[in-house]
Swiss-Prot record:
Biological source species: Mus musculus
Record bears the keyword Acetylation: yes
Protein name: Biogenesis of lysosome-related organelles complex 1 subunit 5
Function, as annotated: Component of the BLOC-1 complex, a complex that is required for normal biogenesis of lysosome-related organelles (LRO), such as platelet dense granules and melanosomes. In concert with the AP-3 complex, the BLOC-1 complex is required to target membrane protein cargos into vesicles assembled at cell bodies for delivery into neurites and nerve terminals. The BLOC-1 complex, in association with SNARE proteins, is also proposed to be involved in neurite extension. Plays a role in intracellular vesicle trafficking.
Tissues showing expression: Detected in heart, brain, spleen, lung, kidney and testis.
Keywords: Acetylation
Length: 185
């Protein structure tokens, strides 16, 4: 690999038919060497195409497997929904209609009895309130009569007291006279 001029033919070149090879020093040969080195480098050291191919293969396989798995999940969901719509939903609806009618009847009966109880309670409260109001009015009338009759009663009691005092005076006066008769003995 000298950078010099021409090469002398080697014995093996002459033996091959006398065809002369390009020398390593010519510009075309350097270009071929660089091209060969680039191919060797890309094959040995540049793994981008291989990596990209592997990535594409992995993504394709992943999407296929994932797609199948999701398809199975969706199919199972569809079967479950169809089974629910065909079997469970009519049974639930029928059970609900049977039980709901009976429940509504019970609820209506309970509601009616509660309304009756509430009405009785309101009537009882009204009777009690009316009685209390009437009693209060009677007591007020009685109180008014009592208060208005007090001066007359007081006058009667005072008169009675005056008479009793007068009688007691007369009695004590009579007793003093009797005592005076006995004390002179």
């Amino acid at each position: 690999m000298s950078g010099g001029g021409t090469e002398t033919p080697v014995a093996c070149d002459a033996a091959q038919g006398g065809k002369k090879r390009d020398s390593l020093g010519t510009p075309g040969a350097a270009h071929l060497i660089i091209k060969d080195l680039g191919e060797i480098h890309s094959r040995l050291l540049d793994h981008r195409p291989v990596t990209q191919g592997e990535i594409r293969y992995f993504v394709k396989e992943f999407e296929e497997k994932r797609g199948l798995r999701e398809l199975r999940v969706l199919k199972n969901l569809e079967n479950t929904i169809q089974e629910t719509n065909e079997c469970l939903l009519p049974k639930c609806r029928e059970t609900m209609e049977c039980g709901l009618g009976e429940t509504l009847q019970r609820l209506q009966a309970a509601n009616d009895s509660i309304c009756r109880l509430q009405q009785r309670e309101q009537e009882r409260k009204k009777v009690i309130n009316d009685y209390l109001t009437a009693s209060e009015k009677r007591r007020l009338v009685q109180w008014e009569e009592f208060v208005s009759g007090q001066p007359q009663r007081r006058a009667e009691v005072d008169e009675e007291h005056r008479r009793a005092v007068e009688r007691l005076r007369e009695q004590y006066a009579a007793m003093e006279k009797d005592l005076a008769k006995f004390s002179t003995f």
